[in-house]
Amino acid sequence: MIPPPNVTGSLHMGHGFQNTLMDIMTRLKRMQQYDVLWQVGTDHAGIATQLVVERKLEGEGKTRESLGRSKFEKEIWKWKKYSGNTITKQLRRLGSSVDWSSEKFTMDADFSDAVSEVFCKLYDEGLIYKGYRLVNWDPSLQTALSDLEVSNEEESSFIWNIKYEHDSGHLTVATTRPETLLGDMAVAVNPNDKRYKKLIGKTVKLPLTDREIPVIADDYVDMSFGTGCLKVTPAHDFNDFEIGKRHKLEFLNILNKDGTLNENAPKKYQNLKMLEARKIIIEDLDQANLLAGSEKHKLAIPRGERTGEILEPYLTEQWYLKTKNLAQEASKLVRNGKVQFVPKNWEKTFFNWMKDIEDWCISRQLWWGHRIPAWYDENKKVYVGKSEAEVRKRNKVSGTLTRDEEYWIPGFLRNCGLLRP
């Protein structure tokens, strides 16, 4: 099967090289009297396609919101019909000996039915669930992204040292993101750090707010980094999220979906973008004599691969695929030799991935793609099924049902062998 290229563009040299190798193998096996199907198709490319069409509409003075979901989908189908043929024409010009009679598009009706069936199967087996967790959030697209869709780029920035005052003085906390202090719920120190033992269990004043937050002890804190004091923002940092769960802290979300500060921030900072808020917060800290200095620092900035936008850790309810058991099964196949890596040294990378794997966020807040086959009753109870009729029949539901608005990314199904054209 040709890994389906996106309908958003045209083939590049990599595609040409890949398809030439596959064509050679296909023709060779046919000459050896094998029955060969070389499957061809294109990918609907949810995020990329939606972005292209939104930019086209922007030039016409329209937005997807102004059109509504149904009309926006029609615009995408029109664009797909116009652009999608570019790739297939290129493949034909290459002379690729694919079976054109079986050409597929990942939004074809039979493919969508298969995707829904697999979602239901995984849900029934307890492998798909819905839960609140931190995600990589793109404020431009206003959707969650998986780690694979994140580009971590090293950029020059600063570390700011901020004073958190208490009854007998202050703690100095080092941070690369002073704007997130508005969502701080604690200052953490290492339980073995003698400098701060007497302060554990007491409170400090959160700068620029009227809140006080506790000083807690956690082994995660590195005594040798900075001052050994760590600001804990459970709703806006992946490591802090885990600390927050351990200490039962409140998860205070200070962001709107568009990346501006919300009503949980002091009024002065509300509706500001994060970098705008950073500038003002640093000025305010300095004026209040709460800024203890800064120093240049290089750090990895997570950006969305498609938009280049700085991503925010964002607490939201999403659909997830449990990966631990799948990772264990995949690792067994490599260890017993049923799956082999060439060259063999890639096994080490593979096992590292499998060991540190997290549950995969598969839902996206998009208007193009495979819609999640889930419905909700008036009490927000969720029902999963291939259709509303099936949900009603299986669960004996007679009241109003509302379809889940979100879409999901089933690309991993092909890689796992769960879905074939």
Predicted feature locations:
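Secondary-structure capping and boundary motifs in well-ordered enzyme cores
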Residues: 2, 14-17, 21, 41, ...
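Short acidic, glycine-rich loop/turn motifs
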Residues: 164-168, 191, 205-210, 377-379, ...
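Short, conserved helix/loop micro-motifs enriched in His/Cys and acidic residues
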Residues: 1-11, 96, 101, 221, ...
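Catalytic alpha/large subunits of respiratory electron-transfer oxidoreductases
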Residues: 34-35, 115, 149, 178
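Catalytic alpha/beta core of large soluble enzyme barrels
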Residues: 35, 178-258, 286
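Residue patterns forming the tRNA-binding/recognition surfaces of aminoacyl-tRNA synthetases
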Residues: 54-171, 225-383, 388-398, 404-407
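Conserved phosphate/anionic-ligand binding catalytic regions in large, soluble enzymes, centered on
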Residues: 7, 14-16, 41, 118, ...
